[in-house]
């Protein structure tokens, strides 16, 4: 998730633990705008959602390959919320690097954040959006995965709660429509009553089973 001020550290992460348990190496990158590294680092990601932040993630993958941690023929990108956005954008910015992409409760249309969702509902939220993604329509479109779906070169899995207030269900539907229009392969899982992430136990079981099956299909079983 993110972007501003969040960070990955040595803490329990359900998805990371699940994937590691299934034999997959998990790489979590503290990209620019992550917390705990000072104001300059925090602000370095402003207006860079679809560019420099994605390059930080891509550079992390290149490092993992160079260090022999990752098999370059078996890499998939997964993320939730902003991570869902990044899952789509990294495949666009680094064609050929990934074999599949999974977006969970993701943001796929930046301009829509000014129209739908709870962030735009108060002045602080609107100020946040202007600071981190800007207001220029051309820039927003140029950095929105749903406007660049024709550049996605891997199978996609989209997962979303239909009552999500932070990243509204309309975000996922926009991405799905864009993939349809571009004739790109994807799988879909949405659940009514779920918000920004799944909380119902049965839905989570289905989610993780689908995630595992998708990974096994496209990059093989874990070690």
Q: Each predicted region: which residue ranges?
A:
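Active-site-proximal cap/loop segments of hydrolase catalytic domains
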Residues: 6, 12-22, 28-223
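Short beta-strand element of the alpha/beta-hydrolase
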Residues: 1-2
């Amino acid at each position: 998730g993110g972007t501003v001020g969040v960070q990955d550290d040595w803490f329990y992460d359900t998805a990371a633990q699940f994937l590691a348990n299934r034999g997959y190496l998990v790489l979590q990158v503290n990209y620019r705008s992550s917390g705990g590294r000072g104001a300059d680092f925090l602000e370095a990601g402003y207006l860079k959602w679809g560019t420099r932040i994605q390059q930080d993630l891509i550079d992390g993958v290149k490092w993992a390959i160079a260090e022999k941690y990752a098999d370059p023929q078996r890499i998939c990108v997964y993320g939730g919320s902003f991570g869902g956005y990044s899952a789509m954008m990294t495949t666009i910015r680094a064609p050929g690097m990934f074999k599949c992409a999974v977006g969970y409760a993701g943001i796929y249309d930046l301009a829509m954040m000014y129209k739908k969702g709870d962030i735009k509902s108060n002045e602080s939220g609107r100020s946040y959006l202007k600071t981190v993604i800007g207001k220029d329509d051309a820039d927003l479109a140029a950095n929105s995965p749903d406007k660049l779906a024709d550049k996605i070169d891997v199978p996609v899995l989209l997962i979303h709660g239909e009552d999500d207030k932070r990243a509204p269900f309309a975000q996922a539907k926009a991405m799905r429509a864009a993939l349809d229009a571009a004739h790109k392969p994807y799988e879909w899982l949405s659940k009514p009553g779920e918000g920004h992430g799944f909380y119902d136990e049965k839905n989570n079981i289905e989610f993780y089973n689908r995630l595992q099956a998708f990974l096994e299909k496209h990059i093989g079983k874990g070690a």
